[in-house]
């Protein structure tokens, strides 16, 4: 994996997640071509969308485009909003059994009458390329062969490229969600960091953050992390995303993260911006997970640098 492209602003290095994600997608495309040339195998990703949520339709379109661009087969299944659980599960069972499908994801949210946890549990853990199942969470926590949730995996890739080694680094993850905080902490622990998970009940949160060589913020509270919370020279990964009124353009909005960027950039050694930092890594890692799942399904060596 090449080092993430960076830009200099004040004292901090700005980690260009968009450029890094493009590099990951390029590596995935190379692995896909080798699977085709050497083994006659084309990785396949199936995406299931229930209903007509506009944002979900945009996300599914982006995933389809990215899948095709790296040479994989994209299977799209769009179901009406009143689809029953039985019918949804019948489709998932069919995809689980299809040897041409190596990765399956159901785009969330689903309509209220469907249960997201039951839906994730129905997907074969070997094809759970979103890394959301309790099976993959358990494998990750026990050091097993898991498919890892895409956003934490993307953050780990950025951090590995930033440091020669993560071993011995003090890392603080703000946020304890099953989707991000917990798997992020497990990944950092797996790379021999000393990890603290902070959350809404953490006492003296700012003091806890000031000890971190690596600070990962994922709580969804706009600009909560101030510049004086950050250890000088620390690497800051901002996973939060909030839409707020634009200060200079009445009636317009802008995206900001959990970290007060203008303050943090003068203190941190390196930082991911919002937007353009962590976000682009998510779909790139979804593609990487699909290649990994394909290789595992066929008993082939996994692509180096694209897994945890």
From Swiss-Prot:
Its job: Catalyzes the oxidation of 5,10-methylenetetrahydrofolate to 5,10-methenyltetrahydrofolate and then the hydrolysis of 5,10-methenyltetrahydrofolate to 10-formyltetrahydrofolate.
UniProt catalytic activity: (6R)-5,10-methylene-5,6,7,8-tetrahydrofolate + NADP(+) = (6R)-5,10-methenyltetrahydrofolate + NADPH; (6R)-5,10-methenyltetrahydrofolate + H2O = (6R)-10-formyltetrahydrofolate + H(+)
Question: What does the subunit section of this Swiss-Prot or TrEMBL entry state?
Answer: Homodimer.
List, alphabetically, the NCBIfam families matched: PRK14186.1, PRK14188.1
- Into which family does the record put it? Belongs to the tetrahydrofolate dehydrogenase/cyclohydrolase family.
PANTHER family, per the entry: C-1-TETRAHYDROFOLATE SYNTHASE, CYTOPLASMIC (PTHR48099:SF5), C-1-TETRAHYDROFOLATE SYNTHASE, CYTOPLASMIC-RELATED (PTHR48099)
Tell me what organism the protein belongs to. Answer: Jannaschia sp. (strain CCS1)
InterPro entries recorded for this chain? Aminoacid_DH-like_N_sf, NAD(P)-bd_dom_sf, THF_DH/CycHdrlase, THF_DH/CycHdrlase_cat_dom, THF_DH/CycHdrlase_CS, THF_DH/CycHdrlase_NAD-bd_dom
Stated EC number for the protein is 1.5.1.5, 3.5.4.9
Q: Which terms in the Gene Ontology molecular function aspect does this entry carry?
A: methenyltetrahydrofolate cyclohydrolase activity; methylenetetrahydrofolate dehydrogenase (NADP+) activity
Recorded metabolic or biological pathway in which this protein acts: One-carbon metabolism; tetrahydrofolate interconversion
State the Gene Ontology BP annotations: L-histidine biosynthetic process; methionine biosynthetic process; purine nucleotide biosynthetic process; tetrahydrofolate interconversion
Q: What Pfam families is this protein classified in? A: THF_DHG_CYH (PF00763), THF_DHG_CYH_C (PF02882)
Q: What is this protein called?
A: Bifunctional protein FolD
Q: Which UniProt keywords apply?
A: Amino-acid biosynthesis, Histidine biosynthesis, Hydrolase, Methionine biosynthesis, Multifunctional enzyme, NADP, One-carbon metabolism, Oxidoreductase, Purine biosynthesis
């Amino acid at each position: 994996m090449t080092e993430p492209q960076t830009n200099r602003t004040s004292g901090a290095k700005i980690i260009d997640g968009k450029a890094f994600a493009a590099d990951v997608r390029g590596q995935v495309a190379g692995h896909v071509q080798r699977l085709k040339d050497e083994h006659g195998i084309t990785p396949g990703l199936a995406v299931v969308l229930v209903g007509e949520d506009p944002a979900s339709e945009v996300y599914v379109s982006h995933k389809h485009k990215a899948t095709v661009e790296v040479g994989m087969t994209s299977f799209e299944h769009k179901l009406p909003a009143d689809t029953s659980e039985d019918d949804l599960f019948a489709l998932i069972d069919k995809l689980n059994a299809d040897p041409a499908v190596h990765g399956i994801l159901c785009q969330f949210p689903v309509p209220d009458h469907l249960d997201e946890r039951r839906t994730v549990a129905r997907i074969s853990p070997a094809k759970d390329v979103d890394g959301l199942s309790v099976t993959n969470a358990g494998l990750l926590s026990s050091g097993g062969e898991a498919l890892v949730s895409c956003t934490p995996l993307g953050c780990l890739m950025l951090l590995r490229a930033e440091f020669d080694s993560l071993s011995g680094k003090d890392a603080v993850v703000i946020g304890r969600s099953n989707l991000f905080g917990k798997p992020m902490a497990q990944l950092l622990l797996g790379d021999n960091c000393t990890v603290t998970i902070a959350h809404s009940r953490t006492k003296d949160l700012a003091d806890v953050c000031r000890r971190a060589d690596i600070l990962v913020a994922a709580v969804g509270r706009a600009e909560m992390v101030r510049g004086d919370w950050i250890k000088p020279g620390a690497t800051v990964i901002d996973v939060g995303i909030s839409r707020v009124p634009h200060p200079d353009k009445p009636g317009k909005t802008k995206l900001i993260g959990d970290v007060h960027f203008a303050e943090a950039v003068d203190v941190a050694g390196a930082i991911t911006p919002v937007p353009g930092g962590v976000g682009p890594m998510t779909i790139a890692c979804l593609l990487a997970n699909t290649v990994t799942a394909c290789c595992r399904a066929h008993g082939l060596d996994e692509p180096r640098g694209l897994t945890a």
